Every structure is written in structure tokens, then in C-alpha cells.
Amino acid sequence: MSSPTRQLQVLDSEDDGTLLKVAFASSDRELVDQHFGSSRSFAIYGVNPERSQLLSVVEFGELEQDGNEDKLARKIDLLDGCVAVYCCACGASAVRQLMAIGVQPIKVSEGARIAELIEALQVELREGPSAWLAKAIQRTRGPDMRRFDAMAAEGWDE
């Protein structure tokens, strides 16, 4: 299993609960330039319609391109809580495992700028999210318990 060799957290992050966590497979924290399974690092950002901020960076040691899926488990665990991971490619097994924990893999062209991807995501959040993003937002908010109050106010007729 590939354990991270280094995991850095931003300590002064101001997450007020409105930030969606999004990961980027990036070697330099500026460009998406890695395949998910062989990614040597992830930059994880918090994003909402108005702002974004770096939350953490996870770096891994050398990984072999051997088809061994054990190396995926730790990466997928580290992305739990993210709504998406942007990468240059993602194998079918990794896609299934990511989707099972609610992380949407998003394939982008190698060299896509993280700042531009975040900006596009913010525009989508402001103008109306796509289906996958709307579901991700709902999952992060949890069930709306106010619906029971509305039902109680209507009363029962038997």
C-alpha cells in the first residue's frame, strides 16, 4: 500500500462549512499533470462560489506502474470527503472505487491550470451546478430535516 511520504495541512484555514473539497493530481500545485493511479501528489482545495483556498497537499513516494491496485486504497482513503478529483486519466477500477465514496473523477487535459479549473467550478456553483455537482452539494449538506417540520405543520388527515 502506498502511504503518503508527506502530508501538509493548512492550519489557518477558514472553513465555515461552505467549502467543497476538491483534489487535483498535480506535481507542482499549479497544473493537473498526473494520472490518478500513479499520481505522486494531490493538492486539495476548498471551493465555494466566492472563494477558494488550499487546504492540504499529500505527497507519495515512487510508485510503480504495475497494475497493482493496493496503491489505490490509501489514495482513495485520503480523498474521502472530497467531491471531485481532477486528473489526466483514471482507470476503471479507480473510477468505481472513487464513485463508491462519492468522489467524482474528472478527466482534464494534461497541463490544465488549477486556478482556471477552480474558477470554472465557481462559475458553475454560481450559475447552477451540473447533475453530479448538485448531488455532491446535497451529500455535503446532509438531509434537510426541515421537511419534517413542514409535514407536521400540514397535519394528519385519516
From Swiss-Prot:
Keyword Transmembrane helix: no
Keywords: Nitrogen fixation
GO annotation (BP), single: nitrogen fixation
Keyword Transit peptide applies: no
Top-level taxon: Bacteria
Family from the record: Belongs to the NifX/NifY family.
Protein name, UniProt field: Protein NifX
